[in-house]
Amino acid sequence: FVMLLGMGMTSCGDFLDKPVEDNYNTENYYNGDASCISGVNYLYSSPWYDFQRGFIKVGEVMSGNMYWGSSPYMNFSTNGTDEDLVNMSYSLWAEIGHCSTVYESLKNAINTSEKVKNQCMGECLAWKAMAYFYLVRTFGDVPIIHSNSESLGKGDYNSVSKVEKADVYEYIIMTLEKAMELLPKEKSTSGRIDYYCAEGLLSKVYLTKAGVSGSLNQDDLKKAAEYAKDVIENSGRGLMEHYEDIFRGSNQFCDEILIAWRWTVGTQWTSQNTLQSDLAPEGFDENGDCWGGWGGPSIDLMEAFGVSPKDDPANRVDPDHRRKATIMMPGDVYSYFWRDHDLPANAQKDGLKKGFSYLDFWYNKGYNAAATGQCQGPCGGSNVKHLYGDNYDHKEELGITPNHMSNALPTPLLRLSDIYLIYAEAQVQMGNNTDTLALDCFNKVRGRAYEWQGFVRKTSLT
């Protein structure tokens, strides 16, 4: 893969001026700051590609947040032969292997500043920890491969035994602590992982680890709170004003996003985001690559937001501002989808002339020539997150045109609001229900969600 990266950096003009240099390898590729950075870039996307579908099915379908027809993830009947589960496992191990290989190669980088070398090595370790964090939560006991080269040298890579979950968590913690030693504290302007991003992940790992034994470990809770507090107070980051704006491509480098998959649109398959294909209804974009209309948010999730599919759209009151940014429902109109489409007169609100009207998409052929006359949303709603809209929307947000099953919308994995709630939860579990910072964190997150309902600040978290 490194060879492919190196070849991809050669310009067309180079072929006119000199013979093709196609013998890049780990000994000569990492030469200079730019090559080290480019050599790490793909860890933010390609190895994760086959994890995307499992990411939704394990995380959202099995949790009850999403309805997905007859999927075995709906009734917990998955087994070791399930294609998406197998691909999910392969993807996570691939990420771990790539991170380890690049990390070891960077040790021998030449003509490279110590700052950039350390930064890149820290990014490798942070992503390796993230992959193991998904592995242990999904599969439980798993092997630990600390060094690819050592395992290959010993020839024991097919016989490595599984390690108990508690020990996997210790390894993740050790990996993140080393990453934090290497990463800069300065916030990146291009979405790269920094010290506080890794520390935020560490706080989440400790909070999760606290319950692994079956009873809450107070020391782990203290660590979760300690690391979360440092991120909150010293990272210099803040929440986006409006929840829905976090997930727009134009805000991909906002303060709130700590760690995200950073996809690209290009010729290399697996570097792209394809979540819209699985989650959006047919005809949502013009690339013929959407088939997710018959799956969608569950009634349970709708009720958690305080709404019901039985509500009359004309009279529905949304108590939670996050609902519309998560679930499309009858009566909803979006300014950031289909912004090159004229809205029907009945859907024009607050001066909005162009955009996406959920009901008109299904029933109005004058608005959508492919309207089927039937709403596919199985529970009365459709997905919003992980969608970019049509080609015009993608270009407006990200500056490039998407391709078939290929878009560049980042996928946030860890946000500052998560860290706020991690701190609050850790304090509550330790019995500190009136901790000032915990209350402030909780109220900031909930206040944004209920901003238009006159949110009343909590004075206790119980």
Regions found by a protein language model. Name each.
Residues 13-69, 146, 169, 177-178, ...:
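An aromatic- and glycine-enriched ligand-binding surface/loop that stacks and positions planar moieties
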Residues 327-445:
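C-terminal substrate/ligand-recognition segments
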Residues 136-138, 143, 187, 208-217, ...:
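Short coil/turn linking the two alpha-helices of tandem helical-hairpin repeats
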Residues 9-11:
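C-terminal motif of bacterial Sec signal peptides marking the signal peptidase cleavage site
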Residues 25, 30-49, 68-139, 159-170, ...:
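Conserved, well-structured interaction surfaces
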